[in-house]
UniProtKB/Swiss-Prot annotation:
Gene designation per UniProt: Dcbld2
Major location (coarse): membrane
Polar residues composition bias: residue spans: 463-472, 501-512, 718-727
All copies of domain CUB, residue ranges: 69-184
Signal peptide: 1-63
Glycosylated residues, chain numbering: N92, N152, N269, N469, N511
Cellular component terms (Gene Ontology): cell surface; plasma membrane
Identification of the protein by name: Discoidin, CUB and LCCL domain-containing protein 2
Cytoplasmic side: 545-769
Organism: Mus musculus (Mouse)
Sequence ranges assigned to domain F5/8 type C in this UniProt record: 289-446
Amino acid sequence: MASRAPLRAARSPQGPGGPAAPAATGRAALPSAGCCPLPPGRNSSSRPRLLLLLLLLLQDAGGQQGDGCGHTVLGPESGTLTSINYPHTYPNSTVCEWEIRVRTGERIRIKFGDFDIEDSDYCHLNYLKIFNGIGVSRTEIGKYCGLGLQMNQSIESKGSEVTVLFMSGTHAAGRGFLASYSVIDKEDLITCLDTVSNFLEPEFSKYCPAGCLLPFAEISGTIPHGYRDSSPLCMAGIHAGVVSNVLGGQISIVISKGTPYYESSLANNVTSTVGYLSASLFTFKTSGCYGTLGMESGVIADPQITASSALEWTDHMGQENSWTAEKARLRKPGPPWAAFATDEHQWLQIDLNKEKKITGIVTTGSTMIEHSYYVSAYRVLYSDDGQRWTVYREPGVDQDKIFQGNKDYHKDVRNNFLPPIIARFIRVNPVQWQQKIAMKVELLGCQFTLKGRLPKLTPPPRNGNNLRNTTARPKLGKGRAPKFTQVLQPRSRNELPVQPAETTTTPDIKNTTVTPSVTKDVALAAVLVPVLVMALTTLILILVCAWHWRNRKKKTEGAYDLPHWDRAGWWKGMKQLLPAKSVDHEETPVRYSTSEVSHLSAREVTTVLQADSAEYAQPLVGGIVGTLHQRSTFKPEEGKEAGYADLDPYNSPMQEVYHAYAEPLPVTGPEYATPIVMDMSGHPTASVGLPSTSTFKTAGTQPHALVGTYNTLLSRTDSCSSGQAQYDTPKGGKSAATPEELVYQVPQSTQELSGAGRDEKFDAFKEIL
């Protein structure tokens, strides 16, 4: 049929598994611009007219015809076509005609990615014509020419058939054209030359036509890291495995900030080159079905991997070497699987235990520098039962798909299945190899569910040379392939295929979109283990919290409850139980303010001293004799012990002429504060007679005043006959208090308080304490 002719143009005749060079047949018939010059004086338009007449005679062949056809892929829904030698200058006196057909009832949309045809003769000899229909009944849509012509508007046909005619005469410049087409409902059609710079949105979806694997284009990057912004979108989509070169398809693009470096890799017959810093990059949104299926991770067990034969031999050191099927695990150290025989009937088979969705395959060679073996081309077969096998083909193509393999012994090469394979068994059949058949494999895909199941590939019946009839059937009962144990004799190098001179270096291809699929047991363990860990952790936390709460409750019940204590009084009592700071015994004498003490009677003072221990003299606890350090009556320095503030023991306003703390006297001789002398022997309420006591430090030559118990406190008189006063006395007083009124032998102010006033003062003093 004529609809298959474009595929013949896109795929030249080739050997087993050899990659096709686009439009090789058309290029072979191309006359050079300089090899066949026109005779002098003859009309230069005579040759194109003869070629046009030849095309009319060959119309029944369909597809593309002529010597002016360039890169061409005409698919059932979309395609791409270029003039010969594009993007370089097309030759003189060439002609090409393309016949495009889509499904009946559909219309065709044509869009130009580049148009550069010389118009020096006003489209007389150099032009491009588009017709509705095919054959003699076709009608012209338009005739186009011009250098750098911007054809932003697409051209639409009236029916499902279109003819495109390119004609060139004598010209000096012009690249020709590149055009893409699709059915009319693909409104977001783009051409194979579009890049992200043609779009302003950070995310968008477009339709790529078939045939965007351009021989002259270049991409940089890989999936999933991203592609450089200069890369053509559709060609990068073929490399990533999201669209097919034969079918085209929809792509979803996400633009992000660029990176300083872009990796190189080989995938789907597209080699991406190393790229450097760019302003932006783009990635593809995919279904996520690109995880590894278990060859590398070990989810696929050794008995599930079989082969037609295995290479086993004993080397000159007597060591046995076995390159069996289970060694064909990608990225596993050690030797690969290698076939004992070297023919096209060898295979490596993988059993997935159940049907899965297989979207790709990654292969590598022997990975051993001393054994440079690899498979350069192979077929892929699939089966549901391991008995009836189907060779993978692309939709609409009546030939087996030959996948490009490795070009060296250590680089990974990825190939994607578009559409994906739904099967349990996968078999790899090498058709070309270097020296020996040796490879490591990993399958890409995901779990398959019956909901939304894709139809299986059902290519047309094969002829008599079907691989199914010539390939050994696997022994599923034993689960192992036959082994050959005889010693391998070295073969001469002239019997081996010649290694290609040109090699393409590709880095490791990483497909990390989806985690590897696992079996039911592994999936069950992956669910149960986290649940058990969380349950045990919760139980331990509950026990720890209960133990902590119980201990805290016990401590709370045993603690002292002091809600009614006054904070200042409680702290003063606690200070007596704490060791005092060691201070120098020879402190500077201080003046002690007795303005408030003068208002207290002997009974009141005795009560206060019984309720609150002395501030400056610490009693001995439990009758133990010890040395108590002296307390200082100086005003504490600011900033020192900021967290502690000692309350005023009298807690009453002071007269303005005095300080809140005792201040040192500016005298040379030693002075001491007036002692507080108590005579408890005559107190009516006292049950035990107490001698007179003093809480102040004695002179330096006297024994320490606080050695022993409270029964040995010192006292002294208020006599001041010497030239220097030994105790501080108030100045400016008019009269002194009588001994009958006060027990303390201290100076008093001129104004005496009445008995009622003193009682009120003492009540306020007790309330503050």
